[in-house]
Amino acid sequence: MAKVLVIKTSMMGANSISNVLNDKFMEYYKEKNPNDEFIYMNLNDEKMASITMTSHNMKEYFVAEYSDKYINQLKKVDKVVMSVPMTNFNVNAVTKNYLDHISVADKTFSYKYSKKGEAIGLLDHLSVQILTTQGAPLGWYPWGNHSEYLKGHWRFLGAKVADHILVDSVKIGENSKKTPQEIIEKFDGEIKKAAYSF
């Protein structure tokens, strides 16, 4: 039995395509793994995720309440399912703030035992499933690839990252007139396959 941390990040609530994607993935995951333990977290509800690192708060930024609490949570789970919409060509602010708070030298990565100078991720027990959405088709804006950023960041921390699911083009053409549920339905087979294998 695995412990699974399920993270939502969208500010759009019920109208969020990434939230619907997350729900659909978890529906299929639970079909295959009904006895797993699930912990749900919406970053919009976490004070930590609204705090951005600046020159004025460096001393307080990594206090236990905002950093160790979430690092320890990751150390106690086996899997992470994280859904993130694209916002202005990148991850949204709550996601960036979360990743900044959990990326701490000698807690989630370290250079101490590196032979070539590269960082060694310390969360190597984790498996991560990334679920992303974006308004434009993949490749329209080459500088904006939040899926690859998320994959790279989790791998930097040592996690094993499954092939991500990207639901793109959600604001283009006919998709702009569809409900989140209708958009996600087109990806149903891909979502089910990924959920069953994660």
From Swiss-Prot:
InterPro entries: Flavodoxin_fold (IPR003680), Flavoprotein-like_sf (IPR029039), FMN-dep_NADH:Q_OxRdtase_AzoR1 (IPR050104), NADH:quinone_OxRdtase_FMN_depd (IPR023048)
Keyword Protein transport listed: no
Gene Ontology terms for molecular function: electron transfer activity; FMN binding; oxidoreductase activity, acting on NAD(P)H as acceptor; oxidoreductase activity, acting on NAD(P)H, quinone or similar compound as acceptor
Superkingdom to which the source organism belongs: Bacteria
Cofactor entry: FMN
Reaction catalysed by this enzyme: 2 a quinone + NADH + H(+) = 2 a 1,4-benzosemiquinone + NAD(+); N,N-dimethyl-1,4-phenylenediamine + anthranilate + 2 NAD(+) = 2-(4-dimethylaminophenyl)diazenylbenzoate + 2 NADH + 2 H(+)
EC number from the UniProt entry: 1.6.5.-, 1.7.1.17
Leading EC class: oxidoreductase
Record keyword Ribosomal protein present: no
Pfam family, one: Flavodoxin_2
Gene3D superfamilies hit by this protein: 3.40.50.360
Binding site for FMN: S10, S16, I17, S18
Keywords: Flavoprotein, FMN, NAD, Oxidoreductase
Record's cofactor remark: Binds 1 FMN per subunit.
NCBIfam families: PRK01355.1
Family: Belongs to the azoreductase type 1 family.
Function noted in UniProt: Quinone reductase that provides resistance to thiol-specific stress caused by electrophilic quinones.
Subunit structure: Homodimer.
Protein name: FMN-dependent NADH:quinone oxidoreductase
Gene name in the database record: azoR
